[in-house]
Design a protein with these regions (language model features):
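Positively charged n-region of N-terminal signal peptides that target proteins for export
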Residues: 1-4
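Bacterial N-terminal signal peptides
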Residues: 6-16
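Hydrophobic alpha-helical segments
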Residues: 17, 40-41, 64, 104, ...
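Boundary at the C-terminal end of the N-terminal hydrophobic targeting segment
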Residues: 18-22
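Short, contiguous alpha-helical
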Residues: 30, 34-41, 51-89, 128-174
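Acidic/histidine-rich alpha-helical segments that form the ligand environment
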Residues: 43, 95-129, 135-151
Length: 174
């Protein structure tokens, strides 16, 4: 009897562990998006409003364009992953800092809600992305995290070129 109870406890424990780890890919994506939200929103807040027109070279995006691009990409990719229709945003890179930062925060909030609907079992489904090109949802999820990492490094460089520390370089409490 004790052996049967022990086996049942072990079966339930293992099945609970398996259930908790049933979406390791999307759980990782959600974690990365949350971390990048902190960094990118922090960078957008750190850059002074008068520097939103800054660009290191004529060929590069302005900081305002960067904030707008991240916001639009978040809405597009998170909608594609969740099966929603991407929102049509009315943003310009020359919009006020307060509007661009609020839109970025809203885009990350939307991604949190949208990505909560996505699980690993659907990552093989095809979605249409830019230019009507198709890719698996897994590719869109990786694209989202890559895009956020790429643009945070860009934002960090823009901040440093203006004598400011990016959020990830600050000590706790700074």
């Amino acid at each position: 009897m004790k052996r049967t109870i022990g086996v049942l406890v072990l079966v339930f424990a293992v099945s609970g562990l398996a259930a908790a780890q049933s979406n390791p890919v999307m759980d990782s994506v959600r974690h990365i998006v949350q971390r990048q939200e902190k960094n990118l929103v922090g960078a957008a807040e750190e850059m002074p409003a008068e520097k939103y027109g800054f660009r290191p070279t004529a060929q590069q995006m302005t900081f305002g364009t960067l904030v707008m691009h991240v916001t639009e990409s978040n809405h597009f990719l998170c909608a594609k992953l969740s099966g929603d229709t991407p929102a049509k945003l009315e943003l310009k890179p020359t919009d006020a800092k307060t509007k661009l930062v609020a839109a970025m925060k809203s885009s990350f909030s939307y991604c949190g809600t949208a990505l909560a609907k996505v699980n690993d079992s659907g990552l093989g489904e095809q979605v249409k992305v830019w230019g009507g090109r198709e890719m698996p949802k897994a590719g869109a999820a990786i694209g989202l995290t890559d895009d956020l990492a790429d643009h945070y490094s860009q934002a960090a460089m823009y901040l440093r070129l203006n004598g400011l520390l990016p959020p990830s370089a600050k000590k706790k409490g700074e």
